[in-house]
């Protein structure tokens, strides 16, 4: 049975049809949402921008002394524009909107024209399609981040409990569950919220995936004396961790 989101089969490439058939044969868990195929294909419609180098903000005369770039722009369009860097990035750390009802805008025109300059309106908690809009926003960006990474590249993406599970499913689809390195949780507060009705969430998360876990290299930095000096001595004379 075909996914209800799959349509216009005659417009798909051979590779796309093979992908659909492979998933039908192999089965498994898949994230289903309205507009899935559009989200998977939309990056192809993004028009790259002309890059203008601001010499006043650049390091000296750009005479080979610096190999880094600071790009100001919408992230999906920026990644499409930087096509020559695909497959060359070691590490991507990203902090997308958490879909809190206050921090995420969506323009419905992006479903057909991702180049529309309007930011759209705030997606509120009362919006019944808020999760679908967020997934459609994120999916092409995750695809592009995957293509930007080196074979041994790493992605670290921040999120909280609102979209944690949807994000994890998207990353499993694009990167492969076998390439998940881990889930880091960090404590964002040390006291319960006064307005919480049930549980007071005190943590946020960082999902870490490798483009190819077998090629990825982590934990290569040994502890330094400076790191050790950040520990306090307890009554027994041993150094213990402390938190600011």
Q: Where do the protein language model's features map onto the residues?
A:
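DnaQ-like (DEDDh/DEDDy) 3′-5′ exonuclease domain used for proofreading
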Residues: 1-94, 98-140
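Structured core elements
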Residues: 70, 93, 156-158, 185, ...
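A short acidic (Asp/Glu
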Residues: 81-82, 166-170, 194-195
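Short, surface-exposed basic-aromatic patches at helix termini and helix-loop junctions that form
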Residues: 84-87, 169-177, 200-201
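SAM-dependent methyltransferase catalytic-core segment centered on the flexible catalytic loop
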Residues: 86-154, 162, 178, 203, ...
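Conserved Class I S-adenosyl-L-methionine
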Residues: 165-187
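Short, surface-exposed recognition loops and adjoining beta-strand edges that mediate ligand/DNA contacts
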Residues: 182-198
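Core SAM-dependent methyltransferase catalytic element
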Residues: 199-215
């Amino acid at each position: 049975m075909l996914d209800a989101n799959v349509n216009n089969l005659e417009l798909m490439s051979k590779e796309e049809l093979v992908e659909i058939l492979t998933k039908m044969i192999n089965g498994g868990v898949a994230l289903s949402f309205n507009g899935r195929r559009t989200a998977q294909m939309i990056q192809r419609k993004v028009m790259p921008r002309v890059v203008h180098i601001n010499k006043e903000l650049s390091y000296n005369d750009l005479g080979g002394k610096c190999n880094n770039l600071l790009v100001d722009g919408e992230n999906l369009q920026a990644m499409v524009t930087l096509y020559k860097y695909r497959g060359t990035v070691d590490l991507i750390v990203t902090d997308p909107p958490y879909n809190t009802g206050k921090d995420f805008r969506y323009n419905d025109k992006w479903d057909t024209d991702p180049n529309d300059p309007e930011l759209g309106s705030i997606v509120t908690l009362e919006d019944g399609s808020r999760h679908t809009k967020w997934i459609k926003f994120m999916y092409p960006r995750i695809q592009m981040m995957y293509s930007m990474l080196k074979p041994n590249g790493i992605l670290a993406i921040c999120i909280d409990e609102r979209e944690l599970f949807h994000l994890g499913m998207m990353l499993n689809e694009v990167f492969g569950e076998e390439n998940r390195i881990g889930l880091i949780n960090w404590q964002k507060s040390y006291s319960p919220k006064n307005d919480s009705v049930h549980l007071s969430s005190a943590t946020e998360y960082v999902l870490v995936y490798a483009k190819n876990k077998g090629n990825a290299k982590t934990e290569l930095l040994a502890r330094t004396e400076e790191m050790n000096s950040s520990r306090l001595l307890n009554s027994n004379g041993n150094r213990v961790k402390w938190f600011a």
